[in-house]
Structures are given as C-alpha cells and as structure tokens.
Amino acid sequence: GGAALRALAGGAQAQDYDLTIAVLPSPHTAYLKMAETIPDRIAEATGGKVKITLNDSLVGGPQIAAAVRDGRVPMSSALHTYLAAEEPRMGIFNLPGLIDNMPEYAYVCEAFWCEDVDAIWLERWNAISLANGAWCTQQLFSKEPIRTVEDFRNKKLRVHNPQTAALMDALGAKPVPLALSEVMPALERGIIDGLFTSTCYGHGQEYWRLAPNVQNWGLGPINGWAILINKEAWEEMPEELREQVQAEMDRFEGEAIYGYYDFVREAMLDMESKGVTFWVAPDSEKARIFDPQYTQPVYDSWYKRAEEVGFDGKAYIEKVRQTLGKDLLR
C-alpha cells in the first residue's frame, strides 16, 4: 500500500503545476476553439509538468479579468471590451473607423498597442498576458433589417462597450447593456430589437433564429481577447517552464491571428446553409454613419475618459492612425 501511495505522490510531484483557466461559454467561436487547444499544447510543451483545465462556469464575462487579479482563478481568457469604460486603451478597436479589420488589429498590436496593454494588464490586473486573439467579425443581428442610418432610430440594441453605446445614442437608437445570458429571452420578449456580437458567437448561440438579419456595418469589427495568468501563479513556475509556456503561447497567438478568417468563414458558411443572408453596408451608407456628427461624440467621450485615466487620448489615437497610415488619406 505504501509503495502505491508513494507512487501517487510521485505522480503528483511530476505534475508540478495544476492551473484552471476560466473562459466564457461560447460554442463555435474562435475564442473557445483556440482556448480548448491550450491544455494539450501546454502539457506537451512542458513535458506534462503544467496541467491546465478549462472551466466555463467559474466566472461571468465582466469578472473574467478581475478574477485573475484577485487570485480567484489562476488564468482566464479575458475580453478587453468589458474593461473599455475603466481603461479606454482597452477599447481602441471599438472607435468607429479606426481599426477596420484583422490585419489592422494585428499591425497595431505588433507596433505598440499589445505592449502597452501588457503593461496595463500587469499594473491594473496583476496579470501576465500570454497571448492575444480576436473574436470573429462583429455583426449586428436584428429582428428587422437595419440597412440605413434611419433604420437605427428607436431600435433597442444590446451593446457591449461604451464606444458603441455612444454611437447608438448619436444615431437615435437605444443602447441596452445586458448580460449575455439574458440576450435570448430579451429577443424573444422584444426587450431588445437586436444586438452587436461576433459572427461566431451569434452563430453558436443561434441568435439568427430570432434575429435573422445579420448586418456588417464595419463598426468596431474586431474585438480582442487575451490569455491571462495571475502574476504570482506565473512567478511560482521555474524560468525554464515559463519559457516553454511562453514559446508555445507565441505559436498559439500566431494561429489565432493568422487563422482568424478560417473561423469567420466556417461560421458564415454554416449559417448560410441554414438560410441566413449576410448583408454588408455599402460604402455610401457607411460614409453616412461615419459622419462626424455621429462619430465625434464617441471620440469626445473616449478622450474625456482618457484624460480622467491620465493620458493624452488625442495623441494616442493619432499614433494609431499614423501607424496604419490613415493620416495620409487625402
């Protein structure tokens, strides 16, 4: 018996680090499909010394970063957008017309933004960011078509960040903050007329059954996520293990970024096979929605929050625009 117990204890020692990663329940999304690869990848990269278990019922979305900060969970796949009110740099991709697609997101990330955000994760959330990715292209799922600027008027739309809320206000819509678990009943009961969400998330939740109009207005099309680990949990690992984990998470990030459109395509093709029609706003209508009378209030509220947090918002946005060459458009 003693030998068997010692063998068990030995096995436990070989399995040096046992970590749980909190994720949002989100079937069919790039976010979850990528996260599901982490346990096997890290076990292989560390020779089984780091064991990671996925859990989708530990923490709600808005708490998913704070839970890591407070040590309630050692790891999570966190969403920047939920923190955009608190820290505006987490919400740059929600500003209309700033970051229009995945290549632009990846470019700005690589240029300076991800490094800036890594420092914020560490300072404000006591977390090390191991990798970045993004949700599939944001779409507007609605019961009735919303295909002109006028169509937004009085529509009750669920939004997930303050920038989109400010834009909806300017357009005469009624932005509604709503927990994800309440979206389906709210659609059923007419509490909301539609919502902005990722293509893949909307596909997995089957929102198209109640909101069959799926429209791409190009409003904050890319929404990021980050794989976080609590600073103390990270520092408990010996350096060699940390290097193995980080090298694997660098590969993971490459797949999340460069394989991004494969996830979007898969979701769109599956929805189309179920009768969903996708609509993309023509440039003429996008030009109307991106008119400064609607977009300026969004930027102004962002600049105001930047000032409260203690950085120069206008200079920050100009840096993004210059990085992407958007200041050169004549």
Segment roles from a protein language model:
Residues G1-G2:
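N-terminal export leaders
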Residues R6-A14:
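Sec/Tat signal peptide C-region and signal peptidase I cleavage site
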Residues Q15-Y105, W113, A119-R330:
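N-terminal secretory/targeting leader peptides
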